[in-house]
Amino acid sequence: MKIHLLDPHTYSMVFGWYLCEMARKLKNGAEISHVIREFEKQMDCMEIVLGPYSLKQMKKSGRISAAAAVMGELMGIRPIITLIDGKTKVEAKVRGDDKVVPAMVELCQKRAGDVEDFEYMIGHTNIPQAADLEKACRKAFGKPPLAVFELGGVVSANTGPDTVALTYTGHPREGKNIRQRAAAK
């Protein structure tokens, strides 16, 4: 038995669907080397946008300071965070829960607006805003998500139990695949 290690440098919410697709292709007779290249090519394009509705867990996990969490909660500030190639970045800050979903969809459209084979998935921590995100995405992208699923403990440990996520096909990054970027670090 040969074992192939694949590290997409992201949460399982992104690569789980594509691992299942790989398994289907292999079961139907595809060559492993072709399937791995296809997987890496797909992962080189995937991006995540997270929308936490509270700063409490982000403070606990050390992502933000206690002072920033208190002030942010008092002012109703909600960060819009991307996770790309294992790096998190606050892309925007919106004021009020009702602005989280529109900001996430807008950021996705900005980053992936002209991607030819655009696909997306929605993750959530079983909160009502998940339905709002799905509805907004269907309207903005003109098609349903590949999947809608509950976020796991790793995401929740970092962003909290009240988070929605949008993962989508963006543009290929840096002209290098995952392995080349990891080796360069």
Language-model segment annotations:
Residues M1-H4, T10-K185:
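Mixed-charge interfacial surface used for oligomerization/domain docking
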